[in-house]
């Protein structure tokens, strides 16, 4: 049993999925995860499919030095800097589909699910080498990552009492 950094509030109304040591760039995956945080499952899947098709961009907010600007990233809590990290989007989309099938097995309502928690952590770097002039060797590192996510059902808010009854009670206490 693997440990998640956060446990869901209601275990019966949520499901989890996790990927470890995924060979995909950490920085791109972090921005992708940040873009779909708190979205409903259906919207998140559609958004990631649009990113893969280059119809919508992922706004880059933290790891954005040298990232070009695009109109697709405007008005998404960024100054217009964005990219289309297709490989990261595909990995996160596969995890969302895995979590969705876990929800179906649990008997949850798939249409009511939203991403309550998604987190990307750095994994151990993988080392390769590249050969340079004059017999030198430089490192050629990759930056894989771990991804974990939790889908939860939207909880129905408690119904508020009608105002007419509240007003009647307050008048009686004042008189």
Swiss-Prot record:
Q: Which InterPro entries match?
A: Ribosomal_uL22, Ribosomal_uL22_CS, Ribosomal_uL22_euk/arc, Ribosomal_uL22_sf
Which organism was this protein described from? Arabidopsis thaliana
An example GO biological process term is: translation
Keywords (alphabetical) are:
Ribonucleoprotein, Ribosomal protein
One GO cellular component from the entry? Answer: nucleolus
The answer to whether UniProt assigns keyword Isomerase to this entry is no
User: Example GO molecular function term?
Assistant: structural constituent of ribosome
Q: What is this protein called?
A: Large ribosomal subunit protein uL22y
Got any disulfides in this one, which pairs? Answer: none
Q: Which domain of life is it from?
A: Eukaryota
Q: Kindly give the PROSITE patterns that the UniProt entry links to this protein.
A: RIBOSOMAL_L22 (PS00464)
Q: Give the protein family.
A: Belongs to the universal ribosomal protein uL22 family.
Where are the annotated segments for Disordered?
A: 153-175
